[in-house]
UniProtKB/Swiss-Prot annotation:
Protein name: Cytochrome b
CDD domains attached to this UniProt entry: cytochrome_b_C, Cytochrome_b_N
Function: Component of the ubiquinol-cytochrome c reductase complex (complex III or cytochrome b-c1 complex) that is part of the mitochondrial respiratory chain. The b-c1 complex mediates electron transfer from ubiquinol to cytochrome c. Contributes to the generation of a proton gradient across the mitochondrial membrane that is then used for ATP synthesis.
Gene that specifies this protein: MT-CYB
Cofactor note text: Binds 2 heme b groups non-covalently.
Subcellular location: Mitochondrion inner membrane
GO molecular function per UniProt: metal ion binding; ubiquinol-cytochrome-c reductase activity
InterPro entries (alphabetical): Cyt_b/b6_C, Cyt_b/b6_C_sf, Cyt_b/b6_N, Cytb/b6-like_sf, Cytochrome_b, Cytochrome_b_C_euk/bac, Cytochrome_b_N_euk/bac, Di-haem_cyt_TM
Lineage of the species this protein comes from: Eukaryota, Metazoa, Chordata, Craniata, Vertebrata
Length: 381
């Protein structure tokens, strides 16, 4: 009998990607996050589709349509809670996935890494426009503050901001187009994910040792399907715990009030997963400088492969680089905390120091550590 999964044109692609895929035998739980991100994307698209069936993208009815979903639609409260907290889980997995890539030198697969950075930017754009849709106070003011940053661009800034708004401020036209963007972007993300996987399967997965694993590979199924299922169970446990019991833990209380252009909240801040970049933006007193620093904080990921100086790929056997990596992690947590604090001392100076440390660590200290570790490994020692 012909094995259909190995001969059918469509099944063959799935088979080579998820079933008979040769995978390194030593990849750890840090390699689970790719599949978890795929699951998160599916959850977000499904819950988002059901929310879009009941949501209206009009400034007069957007807020009440979200209230209607939570009160009158069957399990609408659950769908909304899963979607809102699913975004947090998505970003948690994303940050861990990127961190794994930096720690184990996965960025040396340059095509996969670059598509991954584009994916990160696209997911951030999707989350931003999605945050505006409930049309609460923080939704409105967050959209106003962030889109207004475009006006810092010389010559074309003001025109560009008004073009994005569809008027002279954030209003009905802005909400309608943001809903359109929020609906289409996840499908663009799905296409990019396929390209990401395509490039990954050209080279095969990296592994914790950073050594070529071709001599010791095992089939993806059943070994890693079982392993990924454990990760999925933990993800669902956390997501459902948030959605059922702590649904408003990661949200902003200001979003319980409808958007009011005449009343500014005392402290405008985005969702927690943007706070590190927001802190970097605020740490520079100049508007254009802040916007450039904000962009640089994400786009710096693109030059990480160029800053790799070590002879070893992974940080597994490089204690100095490991130490700097965990300092960078602590630094990002500090930036996230600062982004949620009011603009006053001592938070201003802490934010400025943490922002400076962020760029210093990635661009100077980590490449120098790689060179020093090479020197320490030379035979005369």
């Amino acid at each position: 009998m012909i094995n259909l999964r190995k001969t059918h044109p469509l099944m063959k692609i799935i088979n080579h990607s998820f079933i008979d895929l040769p995978a390194p035998s030593n990849i750890s739980a840090w390699w689970n996050f790719g599949s978890l991100l795929g699951i998160c994307l599916m959850i977000q698209i499904l819950t988002g589709l059901f929310l879009a069936m009941h949501y209206t993208s009009d400034t007069l009815t957007a807020f009440s349509s979200v209230a209607h979903i939570c009160r009158d639609v069957n399990y609408g409260w659950l769908i909304r809670n899963l979607h809102a907290n699913g975004a947090s889980m998505f970003f948690m997995c994303l940050f861990l996935h990127v961190g794994r890539g930096i720690y184990y030198g996965s960025y040396l697969y340059k095509e996969t890494w670059n598509i991954g950075v584009i994916l990160l930017l696209t997911v951030m754009a999707t989350a931003f426009v999605g945050y505006v849709l409930p049309w609460g106070q923080m939704s409105f003011w967050g959209a106003t503050v962030i889109t207004n940053l475009l006006s810092a661009i010389p010559y074309i800034g003001t025109t560009l901001a008004e073009w994005i708004w569809g008027g002279f401020s954030v209003d009905k036209a802005t909400l309608t187009r943001f809903f359109a963007f929020h609906f289409i972007l996840p499908f663009i993300i799905t296409a990019l994910v396929i390209v990401h996987l395509l490039f990954l399967h050209e080279t095969g997965s990296n592994n914790p040792s950073g050594i070529n694993p071709d001599s010791d590979k095992i089939p993806f199924h059943p070994y890693y399907t079982i392993k990924d299922t454990l990760g999925l169970m933990i993800l669902l446990l956390v997501l459902l715990s948030l959605a059922y019991s702590l649904s408003d833990l990661l949200g902003d209380p200001d979003n319980f009030s409808p958007a009011n252009p005449l009343s500014t909240p005392p402290h405008i801040k985005p969702e927690w997963y943007f706070l590190f970049a927001y802190a970097i933006l605020r740490s520079i007193p100049n508007k254009l400088g802040g916007v450039l620093a904000l962009l640089a904080s994400i786009l710096i990921l693109l030059i990480i492969p160029l800053l790799h100086t070590a002879n070893q790929r992974s940080m597994m056997f490089r204690p100095i680089s490991q130490t700097l990596f965990w300092i960078l992690t602590a630094n990002l947590i500090t930036l996230t905390w600062i982004g949620g604090q009011p603009v006053e001392q001592p938070f201003i100076i802490i934010g400025q120091l943490a922002s400076m440390s962020y760029f210093l660590l990635i661009m100077v200290l980590m490449p120098l550590a790689g060179l020093f570790e090479n020197y320490m490994l030379e035979p005369e020692w």
